């Protein structure tokens, strides 16, 4: 894209303005359009020239606009920015290749002003598609789709962003028009500051989300960005690099015992949802009420053909293989799910505070949420101490008491604990224990110093405990 700085009076639909006298085709009663920060323009020529310090032109000058010694910076014969950027357009004649643009005799002055870049709209309204398929617009609408003043021919415009211009014919624009087989996605009111260069009329912002109602295949984000998606890429081509969701595939590994082949093959049917897999296993493999043999034939099942007494128990067991957990916790924010309804019932008591299991020992008022906790508590009232320490043979009524006791052995050395005979490994490495037994004259500080410099031993002796 070629950027041209112009300090002279601007004419909509014409080419590059310049300093100097008005051109020969200027209409006598027309005031120059105000282009500066004043959106309403000025009636004097001096104010218009000062306001139009710079302009950002998106279309080249026409042959009618340029004099015999001038050429446009957008044409390939220009030796300025156009040739430096390598722009080549087939719309111009090759016999101007040696000409140098003069820009109205003030080429150097036209590039002296480097401030106040403004977007200007050449005109308002829509025109029919110009002949020759080389006209393209900025993202959606072409620059030539806007009317120029009466009596001045339409200039061709060029592609600014290749790759985004391909659009299949027949798609209406959000405003109900099709220009150059391209959909206009609301850029006309957003890109330019004024809707009409001749009257002080504000250009309302178009709603990009309103266009999505007319285009169900385009998302609101596509409409807002004004991107034309190529017809052969489909509506989602703009987001084709986004990661697609991974499709879940669940396989049935049930092995039918009626197979005659060896080795027997599993079902291997795949399903996209857990509901489909469970329905398939229940209906086709487990069977109905007429089935008397409730055996799990899932591949590598640890039960190895052992039968269940009831069908519901087999169904609950199959959830171990399928991973189904159909019982979620109904309390907000919990998020836990369970495979068995009994486990959900017990879990819900943690939210409600219900403790239906009372201690059966007379005089004890302790209550518990589940029967297993009550059973552990009952050992307090009886002489039964089933939790025995393997190091010192002490027994406890509750497993938590045994865990607290084991921390005592972790802090002791191998000299005072018969760890080797009890099945527990010593918390002190054998090398340290042998060194302490051989050299009894050293103080504990000396032993600590000698062991701290051994690079082959970890500083934390608890790592040796299993």
UniProtKB/Swiss-Prot annotation:
Instruction: Establish whether keyword ATP-binding is in the entry.
Output: no
Q: What does this protein do?
A: Acts as a transcriptional activator. Required in the earliest stages in both axial midline development and left-right (LR) asymmetry specification. Binds to the minimal GLI-consensus sequence 5'-GGGTGGTC-3'.
Q: InterPro entries annotated for this entry?
A: GLI-like, Znf-C2H2_ZIC1-5/GLI1-3-like, Znf_C2H2_sf, Znf_C2H2_type, Znf_ZIC
Q: Which organism is it from?
A: Mus musculus
* Gene name in the database record: Zic3
Q: What taxonomic lineage is listed for the species of origin?
A: Eukaryota, Metazoa, Chordata, Craniata, Vertebrata
Location(s), subcellular: Nucleus; Cytoplasm
Descriptive protein name = Zinc finger protein ZIC 3
Location of region: Disordered: 65-103, 403-466
Please give the tissue specificity annotation from the record for this chain. CNS. A high level expression is seen in the cerebellum.
Family that this chain belongs to:
Belongs to the GLI C2H2-type zinc-finger protein family.
């Amino acid at each position: 894209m070629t950027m041209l700085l112009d300090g002279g009076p601007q004419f909509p639909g014409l080419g590059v303005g310049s300093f100097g006298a008005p051109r020969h085709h200027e209409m006598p009663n027309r005031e120059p359009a105000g282009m500066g920060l004043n959106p309403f323009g000025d009636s004097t020529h001096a104010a218009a020239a000062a306001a139009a310090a710079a302009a950002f032109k998106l279309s080249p000058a026409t042959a009618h606009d340029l004099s015999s010694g001038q050429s446009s910076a957008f044409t390939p014969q220009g030796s300025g920015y156009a040739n430096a950027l390598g722009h080549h357009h087939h719309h111009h004649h090759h016999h101007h290749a040696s000409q140098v643009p003069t820009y109205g005799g003030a080429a150097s002055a036209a590039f002296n002003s480097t401030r106040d870049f403004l977007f200007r709209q050449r005109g308002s309204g829509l025109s029919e598609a110009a002949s020759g398929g080389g006209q393209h617009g900025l993202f959606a609408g072409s620059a030539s789709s806007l009317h120029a003043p009466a009596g001045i021919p339409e200039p061709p415009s060029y592609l600014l962003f290749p790759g985004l211009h391909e659009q299949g014919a027949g798609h209406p624009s959000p405003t109900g028009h099709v220009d150059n087989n391209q959909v206009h996605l609301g850029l006309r009111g957003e890109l330019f500051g004024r809707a009409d260069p001749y009257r002080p009329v504000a250009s309302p912002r178009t709603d990009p989300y309103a266009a999505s109602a007319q285009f169900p295949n385009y998302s609101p984000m596509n409409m807002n960005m004004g991107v034309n998606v190529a017809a052969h890429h489909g509506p989602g081509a703009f987001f084709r690099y986004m990661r697609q969701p991974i499709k879940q595939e669940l396989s049935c590994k049930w092995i039918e015992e009626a197979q005659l082949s060896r080795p027997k093959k599993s079902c291997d049917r795949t399903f996209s949802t857990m509901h489909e897999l469970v329905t398939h296993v229940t209906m086709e493999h487990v069977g109905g009420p007429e089935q008397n043999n409730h055996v799990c034939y899932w591949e590598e099942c640890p039960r190895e053909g052992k039968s269940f007494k009831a069908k519901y128990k087999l169904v609950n067991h199959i959830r171990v293989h399928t991973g189904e957990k159909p019982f979620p916790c109904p309390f907000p924010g919990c998020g836990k799910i369970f495979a068995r309804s009994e486990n959900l019932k017990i879990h819900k008591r943690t939210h409600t505070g219900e403790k239906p299991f009372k201690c059966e020992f007379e005089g004890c008022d302790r209550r518990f949420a589940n029967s297993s906790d009550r059973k552990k508590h009952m050992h307090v009232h009886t002489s039964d101490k089933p939790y025995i320490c393997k190091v010192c043979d002490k027994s406890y009524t509750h497993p938590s008491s045994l865990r607290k006791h084991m921390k005592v052995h972790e802090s002791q050395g191998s000299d005072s604990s018969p760890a080797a005979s009890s099945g527990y490994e010593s918390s002190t490495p054998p090398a340290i224990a042998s060194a302490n037994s051989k050299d009894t004259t050293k103080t504990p500080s000396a032993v600590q110093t000698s062991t701290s410099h051994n690079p082959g031993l970890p500083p934390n002796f608890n790592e040796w405990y299993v």
